[in-house]
Regions:
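Transmembrane-helix signature of polytopic, membrane-embedded enzymes
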Residues: 250-272, 445
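Transmembrane-helix motifs of polytopic, lipid-linked glycan transferases
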Residues: 236-257, 433
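Short hydrophobic/aromatic helix or loop-helix immediately within or flanking a transmembrane segment
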Residues: 196-229, 235, 239
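Short acidic/glycine- and proline-prone juxtamembrane loop motifs at membrane-interface regions
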Residues: 281-287
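Membrane-interface alpha helices of multi-pass inner-membrane proteins
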Residues: 305-335, 339, 507
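Membrane-lumen/periplasm interface segments of specific transmembrane helices
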Residues: 158-163, 337-423
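Hydrophobic, aromatic-rich transmembrane alpha-helices
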Residues: 124, 128-131, 250-253, 400-409, ...
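Specific aromatic-rich, kink-prone transmembrane helix
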Residues: 276, 288-305
Length: 533
């Protein structure tokens, strides 16, 4: 039943993206692998754990799977009704009502069959996420939980107000409007719920599996909100995205400190950092990728048994997150290599099991498209200019500029970097000092490696520099720059300078909020003026 259900889902997902033909090789490989894993190895430990229904997450899993399949079915319905075959049937005297009824019944039947398999997968993912989070929850601390809830509520109010006044952050009719984001395409194609959507390429091979367990419920919420707002679905997506963002920040605060007040201040500071403010509104893939990356960090620090699952989830959300595999614990290099190799094979098996063999069958074209973003025409010095500015962007919003896109519409983006950013260099020096001071901390080591990875990816390789759009990656990397600083404040607190530590964080919160809210208002004025609802 599970094999049949998942096979139907993969087939429906392929049809929703324009037909099965180009996905046939992947689907054949997928059904074969699933048949082996589910039918032949029906008594395996993995299969048994997959089918365990977790009551904590079961209802959410069912709701998210229902939302995901509603989205897929709705896409197929409109595709079928606009096809030439329908016109031919109507010309033969078959009424539109009859055709609609047949199509709806067929889609409902297939969706019902697929729902079982999707619910099982979503439940497996969510139950492991919740179980991992439970390992770091300390019930005696409550203020930081209240702070996180308040921040989330403020984000919700902000989303509703902004989305009622502008379309710039989700549906302006153009991509690149806000800091080079593809929000328009992502929202219009429901990228979070689409297994084969074009944006879910080699960079995010199984992005849907990491996002849909959360975003599926947003689709159902969006249907309800559409009764009150013309952009109800976008608001629902933004709600869940903001929830994942705050959840990630809350997790980071728990990794950094065991003090309730310090945790609360960390949540407040990170919530008003410029990347967090922008991505609380801008519908993008990076928020859920950021969430899964933090989950991978939690796993390698607290539960190595779940490390493989979280690293695979993070890598499917954004392939570069596979870098976290270097932090898998082992007694020797050989043991680590075997463990990393096993994780890599599991990643590929998951990829093929869910029909994404097409990514490797078209690997040359996929790589060519990806490497066009690397700024091959720029010198290493030009890339360093942009990177030094990017470091500052991870903390505060620098004055952005209104520009004219090459296609003629107005966009809001980073100003050109023609020299080294002094503030960025100062921050890097301070971060290096903080890393040295906290070098015994595993979290500090992980964040230091992630900073080094950002230098390699953004500065040396020059990812995103061709379009001067490094800000898009600020949320994904900024946490690593913040961690050594917060760990230093925690050490100051532990040494007995409690008031000093709290005063430093409080002043920093006020300062960061002042700068970032001012820049945010400038961006908002641009959005409302040029892209009103």
């Amino acid at each position: 039943m599970l094999w049949c259900s998942l096979s139907v889902f993969i087939g429906l997902s392929a049809i929703s993206q324009g037909g099965v033909t180009r996905f046939i090789p992947g689907i054949l490989v997928s059904t074969t692998i699933l048949f082996y894993l589910i039918v032949i190895r029906a008594n395996s430990v993995t299969y048994s754990s997959l089918k365990q229904f977790n009551t904590k997450t079961g209802v959410l899993s069912i709701a998210s799977s229902a939302g995901t399949l509603c989205c897929v079915a709705d896409t197929i319905y409109h595709m079928v009704m606009k096809s030439g075959a329908i016109s031919k049937l109507m010309s033969k005297g078959i009424s539109t009502t009859t055709i609609q009824a047949v199509v709806v019944i067929a889609l409902l039947t297939m969706s019902f069959i697929a729902m079982y398999g999707v619910s099982v997968i979503f439940n497996y993912i969510l139950s492991n996420v919740v179980a991992l989070i439970d390992t770091i929850i300390d019930n005696k601390y409550e203020i930081n939980n209240i702070v996180a809830i308040v921040v989330c509520a403020l984000y919700f109010f902000l989303i509703v107000w902004v989305y009622r006044n502008t379309t710039a952050f989700y549906g302006s009719g153009y991509n690149d409007v806000i800091y080079g984001s593809d929000s328009y395409t992502l929202t219009g194609s429901n990228v979070w719920l689409s297994l084969f959507q074009g944006q879910n390429d080699l960079r995010q091979p199984l992005y849907m599996l990491t996002a849909a367990p959360f975003m599926g419920i947003a689709y159902i919420l969006g249907i309800i909100l559409n009764c009150f707002y013309v952009n109800g679905l976008a608001i629902a997506y933004a709600f869940v995205q903001a929830l994942l963002l705050v959840w990630s920040i809350w997790l980071l605060s728990h990794l950094i400190s065991n003090n309730d007040i310090i945790r609360s201040l960390i949540i407040l500071i990170l919530s008003v950092s410029y990347p967090a403010i922008v991505f609380s509104l801008c519908l993008e893939q990076y928020v859920s990728s950021f969430f899964w990356l933090i989950m991978a960090v939690v796993a390698v620090m607290y539960d190595q048994k779940k490390a493989d699952l979280m690293i695979i989830g993070a890598a499917n959300g954004l392939l570069t997150s596979a870098f976290m595999v270097v932090w898998k614990r082992a007694k020797s290099f050989v043991e680590w290599f075997q463990s990393a190799f096993k994780c890599g094979m599991m990643f590929l098996l998951t990829l093929f099991a869910f029909g994404r063999a097409d990514i490797f069958l078209n690997i040359k074209a996929n790589l060519a498209e990806i490497f066009q973003h690397t700024g091959k025409k720029l010198t290493i010095v030009d890339k360093a200019y942009q990177y030094s500015k990017f470091v500052v962007d991870c903390f505060v919003g620098q004055p952005a500029v209104e520009k004219v896109h090459k296609s003629g519409f107005l966009i809001w983006g980073s100003s050109e970097s023609t020299t080294i950013n002094v503030a960025g260099v100062i921050i890097i020096v301070l971060i290096v000092i903080a890393i040295i001071w906290n070098r015994e901390s595993l979290l500090c080591k992980i964040s230091a490696s992630w900073i080094g990875f950002s230098v390699l990816l953004l500065c040396v390789l020059g990812w995103g520099t061709s379009s001067n759009a490094l800000f898009l990656y600020s949320l994904y990397f900024s946490w690593a720059f913040w961690v050594p600083f917060f760990l230093s404040i925690q050490r100051i607190y532990n040494k007995g300078y409690k008031k000093s530590a709290i005063v430093i964080l409080t002043c920093l919160f006020i300062l960061i909020a002042k700068f970032n809210i001012a820049e945010f208002i400038r961006m908002l004025n641009f959005a409302i003026e040029n892209y009103p609802l």
